[in-house]
Amino acid sequence: TDLGGEELQAAEVTAFTPIDFFGRRNRELKRVHTYIRKKRRKNEMELALLDAFAHYYEQGCEAEQLETAEHNYDYLQREAAEQGKLMHGSYNYHNIVFQGREVVTSNFENAKVGIQIMDLYGFLRKTMEKNGWKQDLGRRMIASYEEKRLLSEEERHLLYTLLLYPEKYWKQCN
C-alpha cells in the first residue's frame, strides 16, 4: 500500500540496515555463549545451546558477511519513504482472516513506512517453521507474492539473507 501527502509526513519511517541487524544479533549470541560457557552448572537447555553454537554462529556470520557495500539497502529505505510504502510490521497468520475468497488483514498497530519485503519475510519464516521448512512451500509462497508484486534483485537478496540467519536459535539463546 502506498501513502501520500499528509499521511506520509505523519508516518514513521523505520531504518533497517541488515549489517547492523545481523552484527548486533551475532554479538548477542557470542555474549550468551560466553556467559553459559563460564557457568559452573549448566542445565540441559544450556548444554544444547553450547553444542549447537558453532554451527549457528557460523550461519549468522555468513548472513552478516553477505551484506557487503554492494548490497546497501539505504536506497530501499529512501524509496519506501519517498513513495510512502507501508509495511504491516507484524504480518503473520494471527492477523489474517479469510472470508470466502477475500483476505482481511487486521492489527495495524505496528504499521509504518518501511521495506515491504520485511512483511513477506516474517510471514514466510513463520509459515516455513510451522511446516518443517518445506522448500516447495516457500517457493510457492514467493511465486504467489510475485503474482501481485515482483521482487527486485535487492529485495530477493535481502529475503535470502534474512532467511539464512538462524533466528530461531537466536531467540532460544535470548
Q: Residue locations for each model-derived region?
A:
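Helix N-cap / loop-to-helix initiation motif
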Residues: 151-155
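Active-site acidic catalytic loop and adjacent metal/ATP-binding pocket
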Residues: 66-118
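ATP-dependent phospho-/nucleotidyl transfer catalytic cores
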Residues: 9-86
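Active-site activation/catalytic loop segments of kinase-like enzymes and analogous catalytic loops
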Residues: 117-150, 163-174
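Internal "kinase-insert"/substrate-recognition segments embedded within catalytic cores
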Residues: 1-9
